[in-house]
């Protein structure tokens, strides 16, 4: 069995301002307001790893992919972030969490719980999860790295330090 080293951040998060849902413009302003340094690249919409690989986005190897998963009963939801080209074995991950039989959650659940469209899933969307019912899981390889992610829309990528992201998300948990 491959040994996955993961950072599990038990971040059952609220939205920032009650029912206020963050979009691309608002999350960029929020990062600025929180004095989190980031670099933003605008680009054509990227819907898949393959499309991203064909783009001219710099530091592509530092971009993360985000998997919105649920358990077999569709009662527990997880947002898993890892580097874009790292493979993951969902069976092994389910044993580490622990959760029975992980699978990809339905698009409707993603849009309702994270308020993002397909191709735009990002750890930043956890800030939109009003019901605090998503467990955020970060791969430990993200530590001490500058990582790239979509800012709520797949028409841009922002790069920021993992620790800044973690620090940003942590206060919104219980």
Model regions and ranges:
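Extended, low-hydrophobicity, polar/charged segments
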Residues: 6-174
